[in-house]
């Protein structure tokens, strides 16, 4: 057995020194880790503050803080028992009114809440379908609905129904079982790629609509940034006028959103503001061609330059413009930014474009196409899981099974109408939009009190009250009373008309009715001035809703009304 030559007392002293040094080293390590964490914390939030100040400026950042505080305290105010009770009462009344208008009632209305014990005969089912089709509704057939129904004609509807019948059981998730659907889907994507001047290695997918196309484009951009640059806190920059689907995508996929103003008089995205907001976490820039609210095409060439310079994907939302914006030049109209190289894949920075074939492609509802500059961009939206016990799983988008009948209906529409047919419809629609725009600018009655927003060059024309003498939402309600279903806008308060083939045929009546209701509102305004406080103001639905939305900073009440509306859709 070995032993130390050192005295026991010295050995104990050395052991004590060793223990003290070990404890001291541990304390140093803990302090070091704490300091590193603190430095990283300071760096992280200093960096965030720097990018916020650079993007929004000092006053813009202060304004953002002020808005957040105002919303917070207003939310507290709305939760005060007396206030909350009054708000709850009014919200309940409004939702009850919604149900009265939307849920069909009466002695002739039969509600089917459970499966029938015995199935109906085909004749009985057809009779019920005829009743449902005949329920009172806004007459889109007469061209009185803005957008919504992009109707290609009765013959096309019959052809689409035949395509549905042939491929009603088809599902593109099984290409070996339904090879015809696979072929049609690939050809639809190819046709849309050609319309938007994609390079030879362009790629795309079909989706259920514009929202899904936008969601997938945002997801692909987020995944690309994560895989290639390691971005874990993604950010996206969009115009204020971009479609709400981009905001939905940020909510779903946890992407920080920056909304950039679209200042008057052009109402296009502020390019300098976009530039200031770009930082290492930016995963996507967005432009619209055109945007939904005002029908304005953002400065895509300028956005493309930013995207190229900073190596960031750029998505162009052509969901609304669809085939009309793609064929403007061939129809004899000015193309957006033609002198600067166009608005599509001819711009080197454009990496993806969303196009709704169920709008001006006149395909059945539930059809849209998302196209990419190349396959590598598209691959970022794929979901692949090779370890599932059910086998290797792969899907191109959020959906698994998809209706092959919709793809067949879309393919049949594109093949039936052809380029010449789409050019003709583009001509008819744009001529109607220009006629309506001209009437607002030049009509002796309309031009005195209304003005066009920006310079729309596609199918959407938005207008607002010029001098404040007339509430634009009262105009919307008056037109609704005449059977029109137009779109009310906010920030600024306005109305827009998205022209379709049915609407184009009714443009003269729309102009006449607009002039008439303006005269009516002028008479009401004069009566209001004469009676003063004794005048009883009656507000229509649009005026009441958007009047509330614009007058309070906290939109929770409006959100509750919207939630009630959605609930009403599922009340049998």
Report the location of each language-model feature.
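Non-catalytic terminal extensions of PLP-dependent enzymes
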Residues: 2-182, 186-190, 423, 435-437, ...
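Active-site nucleophile and cofactor-binding loops and adjacent substrate-binding regions
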Residues: 177-181, 204-211, 238-239, 454, ...
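Conserved beta-loop-alpha segment that forms the PLP phosphate-binding cup at the N-terminus of a helix
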Residues: 185-190, 202-231, 245-249
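PLP-dependent aminotransferase-like
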Residues: 226-283
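Hydrophobic beta-strand scaffold residues
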Residues: 257, 314-315, 486
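Active-site phosphate-binding strand-loop segment of PLP-dependent enzymes
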Residues: 269-316
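Active-site C-terminal subdomain of aminotransferase-like
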Residues: 327-459, 463-468
């Amino acid at each position: 057995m070995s032993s130390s030559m050192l005295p026991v007392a010295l050995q104990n002293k050395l052991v004590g020194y060793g223990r003290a040094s070990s404890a001291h080293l541990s304390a140093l390590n803990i302090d070091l880790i704490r300091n590193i964490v603190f430095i990283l914390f300071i760096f992280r939030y200093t960096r965030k503050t720097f990018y916020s100040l650079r993007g929004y400026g000092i006053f813009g950042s202060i304004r953002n803080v002020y808005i957040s505080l105002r919303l917070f305290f207003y939310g507290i105010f709305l939760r005060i028992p007396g206030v909350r009770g009054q708000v709850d009462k009014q919200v309940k009344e409004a939702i009850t009114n919604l149900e009265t208008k939307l849920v069909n009632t009466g002695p002739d209305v039969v509600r089917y809440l459970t499966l029938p014990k015995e199935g109906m005969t085909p004749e009985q089912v057809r009779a019920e379908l005829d009743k449902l089709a005949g329920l009172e509704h806004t007459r889109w057939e007469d061209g009185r609905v803005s957008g919504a129904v992009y109707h290609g004609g009765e013959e096309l509807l019959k052809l689409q129904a035949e395509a549905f019948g042939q491929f009603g059981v088809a599902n593109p998730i099984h290409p070996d079982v339904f090879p015809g659907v696979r072929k049609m889907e690939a050809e639809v994507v190819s046709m849309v790629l050609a319309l938007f001047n994609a390079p030879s290695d362009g790629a795309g997918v079909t989706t259920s609509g514009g929202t899904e196309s936008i969601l997938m484009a945002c997801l692909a951009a987020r995944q690309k940034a994560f895989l290639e640059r390691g971005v874990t806190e993604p950010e996206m920059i969009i115009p204020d006028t971009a479609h709400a689907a981009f905001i939905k995508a940020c909510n779903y996929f946890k992407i920080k959103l920056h909304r950039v103003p679209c200042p008057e008089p052009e109402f296009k995205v502020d390019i300098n503001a976009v530039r200031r907001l770009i930082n290492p976490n930016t995963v996507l820039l967005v432009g619209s061609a055109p945007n939904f609210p005002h029908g304005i095409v953002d400065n895509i060439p300028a956005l493309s330059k930013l995207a190229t310079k900073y190596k960031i994907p750029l998505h162009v939302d052509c969901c609304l413009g669809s085939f009309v914006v793609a064929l403007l030049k061939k129809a004899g109209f000015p193309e957006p930014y033609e002198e600067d190289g166009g608005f599509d894949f001819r711009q080197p920075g454009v990496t993806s474009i969303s196009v709704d074939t169920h709008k001006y492609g006149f395909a059945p509802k539930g059809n849209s196409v998302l196209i990419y500059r190349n396959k590598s961009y598209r691959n970022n939206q794929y979901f692949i899981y090779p370890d599932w016990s059910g086998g290797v799983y792969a899907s191109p988008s959020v959906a698994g099974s998809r209706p092959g009948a919709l793809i067949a209906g879309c393919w049949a529409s594109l093949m039936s109408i052809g380029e010449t047919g789409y050019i003709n419809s583009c001509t008819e629609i744009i001529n109607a939009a220009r006629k309506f725009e001209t009437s607002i600018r030049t009509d002796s009655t309309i031009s005195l009190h209304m003005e066009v927003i920006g310079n729309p060059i596609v199918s959407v024309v938005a207008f607002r009250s010029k001098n404040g003498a007339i509430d634009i939402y009262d105009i919307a309600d008056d037109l609704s009373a005449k059977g029109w279903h137009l779109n009310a806008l906010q920030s600024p308060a306005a109305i827009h008309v998205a022209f379709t083939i049915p609407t184009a045929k009714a443009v003269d009546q729309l102009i006449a009715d607009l002039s008439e209701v303006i005269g009516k509102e002028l008479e009401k305004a004069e009566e209001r001035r004469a009676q003063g406080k004794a005048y009883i103001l009656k507000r229509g639905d649009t005026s009441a809703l958007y009047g509330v939305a614009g007058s309070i900073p906290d939109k929770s009440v409006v959100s509750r009304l919207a939630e009630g509306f959605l609930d009403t859709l599922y009340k049998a």
